[in-house]
């Protein structure tokens, strides 16, 4: 199976996420990563969906997705043609004897220290899924107490955009 990243532009309405995820579920696809958020247009949301699947069955799902009235556009983003990032928060055991190692590891991976107490250090890291997996592998021997990781968010490289808009405007979140 191959890892596929789909960027799906949808109407920002209730129930759309349920309908999209139901299509994947009916075809027995496991969604490895899912991130949904607003776009530069307050009427639209972007879903970034990562699945491990063969190309032919995935093509069937994307055809069915295109039939949903709330789906505006679907683009498959391949690794080199897209910028992909995830967010990781990880709480690591860090007694005084190991604290320097934890802090040096954070610096090496450009992670930020967001909380420190007598027994643990909490780090925030952003990067590619591979980078975050490497960070976790280095921290594992020290003892990971807990972690939370976001889904992948991705944009295609270059000047083109899914919405076709030449200039993006920020969403007003004060309303």
What are these regions, as identified by a protein language model?
Residues 1-46, 50-175:
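Long, contiguous binding/interaction regions
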